[in-house]
Design a protein with these regions (language model features):
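PG/GG-rich flexible active-site loop of Rossmann-like NAD(P)H-dependent oxidoreductases
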Residues: 1-8, 27, 32, 59, ...
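Residue-level recognition of oxygen-bearing side chains
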Residues: 8, 37-40
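Catalytic "switch" loops of ABC-type ATPases
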Residues: 5, 48-49
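Short, small/polar-rich loop/turn modules that mediate ligand/substrate recognition or access, typified
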Residues: 53-55
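A glycine/serine/threonine-rich, flexible loop-to-helix segment
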Residues: 3-26, 68-98
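Hydrophobic "lid"/C-terminal helical patch
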Residues: 42, 46
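A conserved structural motif in NAD(P)-dependent oxidoreductases
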Residues: 27-38, 49
Length: 98
């Protein structure tokens, strides 16, 4: 997945926090993902709705493709679709709380 704003980000040294906050500025979605958005993709793939799927490369990354060195789409200033926060145990990383 792309950069997900869970408490796992807090394990990085504080010297890296600013870079982790800013990494999404160039991404098409303009925000970090949520644990619920990752789990929603997993739930879909495990559901009857995906019964005819035999193989897939499903990128749940907000347009940030690791290892590619760039983005497929250009970010639009001020555009950010609302996050799906359907996972009741999700906690936002401290470094993203402002």
């Amino acid at each position: 997945p792309g950069f997900i704003g869970t408490t796992g980000l807090d394990r990085y040294p504080e010297s890296a926090w600013q870079g982790l906050k800013n990494v999404v500025r160039k991404a098409p979605i303009n925000r970090h993902g949520t644990a619920a958005e990752i789990s929603a993709a997993v739930v879909f793939l495990m559901s009857e709705m995906a019964a005819f799927i035999t193989g897939i490369d499903l990128r749940v990354d907000g347009g940030i493709h690791h290892g590619r060195g760039g983005f497929l789409f250009k970010a639009k200033a001020g555009s950010s679709p609302p996050a799906f926060n359907g996972f009741h145990r999700d906690e936002t990383a401290e470094l993203l709380k402002d």
